[in-house]
Amino acid sequence: AHKAAQHNDVLGDICLASRRVEKCDQIIDSVRRKKSLKDPSKKLYSRAVDALDIPALTKLIQDTRSEIVINLGTAYINMSVLEACLAAGVTYMDTAIHEDPAKVCEDPPWYANYEWKRKDRCKEKGVTAILGVGFDPGVVNAYCALAVKNHFDGIDTIDILDVNAGSHGKYFATNFDPEINFREFKKVWTWIDRQWVCKPVHADKWT
């Protein structure tokens, strides 16, 4: 929200939506307190909505005249938000693959399970869906592309490790949603030598 506010001269009016509108209002207060709103003439406001209620979410998108929906919710809501964007005819962005809460660690290729099945409908509706623009995938991909294009003559392998730096005084800190982290302990898929490999968690040790 802060980053979007910093670029609201391009993005225009911004609506934050969640089941609990109070959470959105706290974020808006933080944006205003830190003076993150680049163009104060643009609106920054909140609305309450259940993202799993596709008709209600579609109506909210239409009522707010939104042109882009940036989905920063749990991965369980990705497909309902995408369906609402298809119904409203607006651009969709998310930060991770969709997850079915009833299925733990589905087999890859994950995007083929849900997102790619809607590719033809996105094309028919003229809807752009930009997937996985969080950190991994997302920022990681951008750094890898930068390294390949500007810093190395050739790259054989790239190892991606999820780590935390520093200390905030807590015993355990997750890189992602804690539930997603624990689900991934059940089954671990890794891309090795151009193929998916399933191994037990912590099967490989780094020395």
Residue spans for each PLM region:
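N-terminal Rossmann NAD(P)H-binding glycine-rich loop of SDR-like oxidoreductase domains
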Residues: A1-H7
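Short beta-strand element of Class I
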Residues: D13-C15
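Helix N-cap at the beta1-alpha1 junction of Rossmann-like dinucleotide-binding domains, i.e.
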Residues: S18-K23
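Redox-cofactor binding/interface segments in oxidoreductases and associated redox assembly factors
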Residues: V69-N71, M93-D94
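Rossmann-fold NAD(P)-binding glycine/threonine-rich loop
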Residues: A87, T95-V127
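Rossmann-like dinucleotide-binding core of oxidoreductases
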Residues: C122-T207
